[in-house]
Amino acid sequence: MRKGIQPALEQYLVTAGGGEGAAVVAAAAAASMDKRALLASPGFAAAAAPGTYIQILTTNPSTTSCATSLQSGALTAGPLLPSVPGTEPAASSLYTTPQGPSSRVGLLQQPPAPGRGGGGGPPAKRRLELGESGHQYLSDGLKTPKGKGRAALRSPDSPKTPKSPSEKTRYDTSLGLLTKKFIQLLSQSPDGVLDLNKAAEVLKVQKRRIYDITNVLEGIHLIKKKSKNNVQWMGCSLSEDGGMLAQCQGLSKEVTELSQEEKKLDELIQSCTLDLKLLTEDSENQRLAYVTYQDIRKISGLKDQTVIVVKAPPETRLEVPDSIESLQIHLASTQGPIEVYLCPEETETHRPMKTNNQDHNGNIPKPTSKDLASNNSGHSDCSVSTANLSPLASPANLLQQTEDQIPSNLEGPFVNLLPPLLQEDYLLSLGEEEGISDLFDAYDLEKLPLVEDFMCS
């Protein structure tokens, strides 16, 4: 303490850190206060809880005391911080976050910087201006940050301003549209050679945009540099009269038409398959599931044509090779035999008539030997009818055919196309009503070999 200077009132502030303990404020004269006696007093130690942080503020920079942390009654010394004379701040609100005008801290005194001529002048003071409205960052209020390219908000009632006709859209200035115009100039140029300076003038664009197009086209080998400012087209022909481009367009159109036709055929096949399924599964249609000879001949498309009827088991394989000269059909089946019939043309003289024995297909069953005997007994004469003997007009037919192979009616609707059996496969025999003369009535007995010849052989 300097001589001649009135001692100032000092303030000793003791606060409890960590939210524990209470603040103890003691004020005394600097000359008569013993700091060490105050910290060591029993009442002061009892008021502070363990872990309490003690800070003492004083105006005398030479005064050495301590800011201690009490741990189970132990006390350690530390440096002191000066306080502001003439102020008595509340211990509960000091060094806390300010909440408004009521919690403002008046003055906070800082210790003088060392080396200022012995500290003779008044200490430096700094005022904390936190404002009346609280935190300094909240004093201006919340503001939305402004975006650099954000458009101004438009009220819903304000009408949209239409663009003027002179303004160009983004597509008009795009590089793709410019490339199409550049290709049109190439197609109109002779021999596919184009001057880039002329192209820039015609298209009314900068020359660097033309270079952007030529660099890409040259990279994919569609053009090549003829000279400094001339390029030549290297792709397909661009003329409309002919060339590869017109041919490709024609082929694309043809493929589209064929695809539509194929789609139409697929729909027809599905429709026919569904109709056939409904016809075959219906019980009312099963009794009518047959085709007669008259039904086949009534088809106008089969008029004056040879009709072959194939009766084959299920899963029969039919192959028709692509041949221009002659038509061939290959049939193969592993489920059973295949029967092939020729459907002859219908004539006026020999019109088939349905009899009592004729089935619903128009076919007449083959008569047995008993039926032939009953028919022969009904006639007055004993001779065999000419109609039954007509196929036996020659000896060759007699030797190659038997009774079961002789057709009962030559006017039948179908003719069997199977090859006849060989002579060794026939067993000649006579019926019950036939005699030995029936075997030789059509033969010339003079031409028959003698019995001796049979004996010698």
From Swiss-Prot:
Motif DEF box positions after renumbering to this chain: 201-237
Retinoblastoma protein binding: annotated span: 424-441
Biased composition annotated in UniProt, kind: Low complexity: 155-164
Location of the region described as Disordered in the Swiss-Prot/TrEMBL record: 80-171, 350-387
Localization per record: Nucleus
Biased composition (Polar residues): 93-102, 371-387
SUPFAM superfamilies for the chain: E2F-DP heterodimerization region, Winged helix' DNA-binding domain
DNA-binding region ranges: 147-237
Region (Transactivation): 383-457
CDD domains: E2F_DD
Any GO CC annotation of this UniProt entry: nucleoplasm
Location of region: Dimerization: 238-329
Molecular functions per Gene Ontology: DNA binding; DNA-binding transcription activator activity, RNA polymerase II-specific; DNA-binding transcription factor activity; protein dimerization activity; RNA polymerase II cis-regulatory region sequence-specific DNA binding
One of the GO biological process terms: positive regulation of cell population proliferation
Cell cycle found in the keyword field: yes
Homology family: Belongs to the E2F/DP family.
Subunit structure, as described in the record: Component of the DRTF1/E2F transcription factor complex. Binds cooperatively with TFDP1/Dp-1 to E2F sites. Interacts with retinoblastoma protein RB1 and related proteins (such as RBL1) that inhibit the E2F transactivation domain. Binds EAPP.
Function in brief: Transcription activator that binds DNA cooperatively with DP proteins through the E2 recognition site, 5'-TTTC[CG]CGC-3' found in the promoter region of a number of genes whose products are involved in cell cycle regulation or in DNA replication. The DRTF1/E2F complex functions in the control of cell-cycle progression from G1 to S phase. E2F3 binds specifically to RB1 in a cell-cycle dependent manner. Inhibits adipogenesis, probably through the repression of CEBPA binding to its target gene promoters.
Protein name: Transcription factor E2F3
Native source organism of the sequence: Mus musculus (Mouse)
Lineage of origin: Eukaryota, Metazoa, Chordata, Craniata, Vertebrata
